[in-house]
Amino acid sequence: MATPEILRKYREPIVARLEGVLQERGPLGEMFSYHMGLQEADGSPGPGIGGKLLRPSLVCFSCEALGGQIDAALPLAVALELVHNFSLIHDDIQDKDELRRGRPTVWKVYGVEQAINAGDGLLVLALHSSLEAKTLAAEMSLAAQKTLLSATYRMIEGQVLDLSLEGRAAGVAEYLDMARKKTGALIGCALELGGIAAGADEGLRGKLRALGEVLGLAFQIRDDWIGIWGDPEVTGKPVGSDLLRRKRSFPVAYALERDPSLEELLAQDPFPLEEVLRRLESTGSKEATAGEARKYVREADRIAAGLPWEPWAKIAFGELLSFLVDREA
């Protein structure tokens, strides 16, 4: 599937600015550069900044869609991406994940204690970057700070909820509350920050935030589908990888509401993957998960239709929605 315009158009300026921000030297800078893919642990060149860069791309898109200039949005876009990466470093510690994008995680290379410091440092860099949006009026700059901090807090709340779901039969409502915060908060923040950079009023900013939160749910639920039924040749992970990690994702929450006895299987060691997959199929979880992601894509499309975006932006956003709901990785 072709990469949508929104994820192509802004990648180069975002990467260039990220590389400029990540010039910190010393042990802390070394960990930043390693995590972001700029260098390996031995100091040799890394694979480069990876990932979709969805959040910072949405900041830039949201600004331009309202007639704003990308230069006003870039510092905020980079700030949001750094917040996201602060959360990834800490999530890897909490989830005991040893690999990220095919490379050992920061805590596996540098130890848990130093990885915590690296995450904290990225958060500070993020806040510093958000102050570099010098073309914004003081009122809008303050609004951007409040928006970023509020979304970061809600994202952390979501991580707390995510950890609390482990080992118990949480249902769909609890899952959605968690995902709306853990994933939706930063994606909502992305569209709102872009609106701030373009000078949007509070009413419009609220609509942008709501759109992003719905988009975040669609993104996360599709991610959950891929984490269980994704093609290993595309994802680089085995079928059922999220199940093997004991992750309480949407498919599991949906299935548990229909087959509570599944909880006993989920607790077994060694993990009975084939039987769990069979139970998920029997509850209709696979189809329901795909349908739930499509539901939120339709809701996002409805909200976007009412926004005062330029015509090209509505086309580009529709392309992004199709990509997110059908993507395989």
Model feature map: region roles:
Residues 130-149, 259, 286:
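Transmembrane helix-loop-helix
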Residues 1-83, 89, 93-108, 160-169, ...:
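Conserved N-terminal diphosphate/IPP-binding helix and adjacent helical/loop segment
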Residues 276-329:
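C-terminal charged capping/lid subdomain of soluble metabolic enzymes
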